[in-house]
Amino acid sequence: MAEYQRICLVHYHEIGLKGHNRSKFEMRLLKNLEAHLCAYPVVTIHRISGRLCVFLKEGTSHDTMVECADAIRSIPGTARVSCGFKCERDLDQMTEAGILAMGESGAFASFKVHARRNHTDFPVNSMEINQIVGGRLSEAYPQVKVKMKDPDLTVGIEVVQNAAYVYARSIPGIGGLPVGSSGTVMSLLSSGIDSPVALWRIARRGAVCIGVHFSGRPQTSDASEFLVDDIAHVLEKTGCIARVYVVPFGDYQREIALSAPPELRVILYRRLMFRVAERIAFYEHAKAIVTGESLGQVASQTLDNIRATNDAVSLPVFRPLIGSDKLEIIAQSQRLGTFPISSQDAPDCCTLFMPRNPETHANLTAVREAEAAFPIDQWVEELACAAEPHDYACPAYKPRKKSLHDLMTENDGD
């Protein structure tokens, strides 16, 4: 039996509905795959008739192909990944490749063949391919039943212009849209459980995510910053995070805690955080702010308090977890691989100078009056200028030539 080149066929769903913009989404996904599969023996990646095909080097083992497919499935924009072989547009070769693919698919009691002919210059139509190749595969596996509805295994055959692709093992991807196809957002990122999940959900919708972490430094240690860095390294494996700004926030919290009404501290902290995030967002050309808030989960996340924090900024604020309960968020965190990191205790600004009885139904007028006692605009500029950027692997992100600090320093000089 001949040796055939191994491939991973990448199927997508939403991208296929994009009409005239479809090619842009396909190319964005292709570029993201190229960047994140550099550790695997990939020869090239091509667009073929509504799919992306990842071609692997000659001699690539089955296990390596499966590892590559597992990496692909976690890239936003991927609906399904199929492991298989490239062969000639020849029924004998399609049969041989099908036998190989079935042999690597584990145990199954029934199967069917599903062929798709994308070029009519091949004389055998899809139904005939199903019948001919299906009959031959049935002879090769006489103990296995042919079952047209809900079989254990489906052997797919894609006949394109100059080749055929045959596969049997398919695994679901995470779906969504490729990162970089939906603009840029600024995501508040703590070392806790919720915010990394919120960031991932927005990245899965195609946004380039830039994190901003408010550290309790110098009033606390920098332990939370190391945890956030670990979280970012998990998220960067799939290109979901481009950069994290670390903002030393502790001294400003202390100023608020010393002078503001105790019950309003948390809201004033968050309003200042939002303003700083928005200031950095303008520099990064980000179009929205993202938080990990879930309605009613803690005191700051009631409707009145959410309204009071939203009032501080002009950018839209996205809350991907707003309707999720804690168990759902934890389960998603475990699947992402961030949960073990987020479960570690570290002092941060979320626990610093917390009041005993925080306001749960803030009056917006009272909040604005309390905030007016502080030089908020000055603080926003100081905090944004002090923000420390840390970059991660995100092929869709193009950093500006001048840093935020340099740009703000130049403006101050003017």
Question: Where are each of the predicted segments found?
Answer:
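RNA-binding accessory domains that recognize and position tRNA/RNA substrates
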Residues: 1-186, 196-242, 359, 364, ...
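Structural beta-sheet core signal
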Residues: 187, 211-213, 246, 291, ...
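Active-site adenylate/phosphate-handling loop in enzymes that bind or generate adenylated species
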Residues: 132-137, 143, 170-182, 249, ...
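A short alpha-helix-loop-beta-strand transition element characteristic
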Residues: 337-345
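Conserved G/P- and acidic residue-centered "switch" motifs that form tight phosphate/ATP-binding loops
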Residues: 192
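Small/polar glycine-rich anion-binding or flexible loop at a beta-alpha turn
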Residues: 297, 345-353
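A conserved beta-strand->alpha-helix junction
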Residues: 232-259, 346-349
